[in-house]
Amino acid sequence: LKVMASRRIVLLGKTGAGKSSVANTILGEEYFTVSHFSPSGTKQCQEKTKCVDGRSITLIETPGFFGTESSEDQMKAAVISCITQCAPGPHVFLILLKVERFTKQEEELIRDICQHFSEEALQYSSVVFTHGDQLPEVEEIGDFVCKNVALNNLVMKCRGRCHVVDNKYWKRGEEGNYRSNQFQVAEILKTIDQIFEANNGGCYTNEMLQNVHREIQKEEIMIMSSSVSLSQEEIRGRAEVKVSDRLLILFAGIGAGMLTGAFLGVLDLLTADSEHNYVGNCQVLTKLFTRYY
């Protein structure tokens, strides 16, 4: 079986949207920790790579960047983890929303995502609705979307791409049945392929993610020269940890909310090659962050 090129998929959504469960549903196994009790859900990025129907999929579940109750230090570590794991950028964003009334809170969530990511990111996005059991029997998700102007506008900006799953009631649906996760996951995978191909295999990126990617590549070369027995996955993992540690030092005086803005493309990361540059770059970043926030 020929394996297609790897796709990096980032799951976005507020706390309680069901990101961990959707990730497990797509991969077909319980890889991601589902938090039913923590008010903030996932505290750190969770990442898993698996071959799904001939395609290598790397799912990166983000913590609730929007509306999280995590501490400043937890949030900062989580954002930096996402930066290093995503670099040089995700091929697809899955924006998760519940099948429920589209309130001002949801509108604000979408407004924040669009504001931080830019309109271009929506070319790499699809909306995935959770709690599909709330969808009336006679409706498909497109019917639900059309009932709300703001929601319909969002889906249209994502070029009409939307799907629905149910992490509780649709687990054992028959093949070909619209109201089954098996059917919906197959459709989601098709959409991921379409986005990947429409962008010629390119990913959403910005200067910050590109700089982080270059730093990871440098670390990989150094690790390979001293540890020839490690697998490529182990080398990448160690390189990410080293770069992540450097970023934690670099952003020691930067607030997590501001750092989130940098990750989402509001600002560019300046490459730090020395201890002197760490200090200088931190001062520059502080000025830039102050300008935007």
Model-based region annotation:
Residues 67, 74, 85, 95-101, ...:
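Amphipathic alpha-helical interface segments within eukaryotic helical scaffold
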Residues 95-98, 127-131, 164-166:
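Conserved beta-strand segments of the P-loop GTPase G domain that flank and frequently precede/overlap
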